[in-house]
Regions:
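Aromatic-rich, lipid-facing transmembrane alpha helices and their immediate juxtamembrane interface loops
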Residues: 1-285
Length: 285
């Protein structure tokens, strides 16, 4: 494994040790620190297994993935606190809330963006490693969605992403985690962009299963590491909200796999707007 992979693993171990020792700076910044270590570790594994990674061969792609991660997660923050501009109690999140956050607004924003920048890279690198190992030979019967099914998915997706903004309700959180995938994946498929739908037409399920499993892995790690951090988030949902594993209500874990499909679709829809002659290599995943 490349040196930066071992450095990343060292960061994860050191961050956990310092957290247990109640070191205040690490405790307050634990999420971005530990996830930076995880991304470095998985990037090193990806380079070892596939010969490619964001920090070795695909650096421009890595920057694009991180920027898309920041922007898309701020979109989800808007869903979570749709009335934030009113101030006061209106800024409280519908589904998750942050605690013990940095009082300085500039430093807080740095912390937010740093943490948000690790989301897509963490998901995609985990999926890359799983695709190269566990799901390398995953095959299914070839399946091609009909034009009508694609159109229906786009319509349902458009409604799903619009309704939680127009009608603010804590009950609508599932729409946020599936709507963008339903809206954008058919568009990526029809325009020839990287797409797990396109893979299925050839019977290749490796990317789809790797993304789903990668979401589950990262979801458990998010909640496990968040539970012990000083600066952390908690959830408020109207269904089985008191039945939890760490801070996440048990039903919430079902959202991580489709969330990963959504992140993948969002990223490749955004990436698809770049000029074909931009010189970018084919994407890592």
């Amino acid at each position: 494994m490349r040196a930066h992979g071992w450095i990343g693993l060292g960061i994860v171990v050191a961050a956990e040790a310092l957290l247990l020792a109640r070191e205040p700076i690490v405790a307050g910044w634990f999420t971005p620190i530990v996830w930076t270590g995880y991304v470095l570790f998985m990037d090193g594994l990806a380079a070892r297994l596939t010969g490619r990674s964001y920090l070795t061969t695909d650096r421009v792609e890595g920057v694009l993935v991180a920027l898309a991660s920041i922007g898309c997660w701020w979109l989800f923050e808007l869903y979570n606190a749709p009335r934030f501009w009113r101030g006061g109690e209106a800024v409280a999140g519908l589904w998750w809330r942050y605690h013990n956050i940095e009082p300085n607004l500039f430093v807080r924003r740095v912390g937010y963006d740093w943490a948000f920048a690790t989301i897509f890279p963490g998901l995609f690198l985990t999926a890359t490693v799983l695709r190269a190992t566990v799901f390398a030979r995953a095959r299914v019967t070839p399946w091609r969605p009909s034009p009508r099914a694609l159109q229906l998915a786009v319509v349902v997706g458009a409604v799903s992403v619009a309704v939680p903004v127009l009608f603010v309700s804590a009950w609508l959180v599932p729409l946020v985690w599936i709507g963008w995938a339903l809206l954008l994946e058919p568009l990526n498929y029809r325009r020839g962009r990287p797409s797990w739908l396109a893979d299925l037409t050839g019977g290749d399920a490796s990317r789809l299963l790797a993304l789903l499993a990668g979401g589950a892995v990262c979801g458990v790690l998010w909640e496990f590491w968040n539970y012990w951090a000083a600066t952390r988030w908690t959830y408020s949902v109207p269904y089985l909200g008191s039945v939890k594993i760490f801070e996440m209500p048990v039903l919430g874990y079902l959202g991580f796999p489709p969330f990963t499909l959504e992140c993948y679709s969002m990223y490749h829809w955004l990436r698809g707007w770049l000029d074909a002659d931009s010189g970018l290599r084919p994407p890592l995943l």
